[in-house]
Amino acid sequence: MNNIKLHSISRVKVNLYLHVIGKRKDGYHNLDSLVAFPNIGDKIEIYPSKNINLTITGRLKKELPTKENLILKASKLFKNNKNGADIHLNKNIPISAGLGGGSSNAAVVLKLLSKLWNVPLPSIQDIVLLGADIPVCMDWRLQRMQGIGDNTSFISFQGNLWILLLNNGDKTPTNLIFKNLSPNNFSD
């Protein structure tokens, strides 16, 4: 294999506001959110290889199962692909903290594999099936996210935006939050 190495930060996703509008028949919730991507997050490196391999390092590596990782699921979206890659994730984004770490990781890996293999990105429909908020993570500009996360529009913003992120260490899986959300908690 040659010495090609592609790398990128995988930024956290911060919902500056998040309104849950209602629940759809398919179980997903319709959202309205303003999303920012501060320049902090995980680090991902990709090298050519014969197979798809994932290694995880970093202070949070023990909390993240390799086999069920969205990164590996994302790599399978390239249908009929015979290429491989060694993918290295340095995990810094807290898990189950509402910061979109898995979705951001998947988005970055999709972009890097597309570039490494010189193939088009999978369809947005396939990407949404993998994770509803992965499409918004494909571009780090300030965005308004609607629908289940698949309807995005860029927001013009000049200047700096300061955000303080605090994590008390409690895990709060997003799917559990939405599962326990009752209609009287929906935004008007």
Residue ranges of predicted features:
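Short, ordered beta-strand-loop transition motifs
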Residues: M1-N2, S49
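Anion-binding (especially nucleotide phosphate/pyrophosphate-binding) glycine-rich loop
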Residues: I40-A106, L113-I124
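Generic hydrophobic alpha-helical membrane-span motif
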Residues: A107-V108, D139
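ATP-dependent small-molecule kinase catalytic core of the GHMP/sugar-kinase superfamily
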Residues: N2-A36, K115-D188
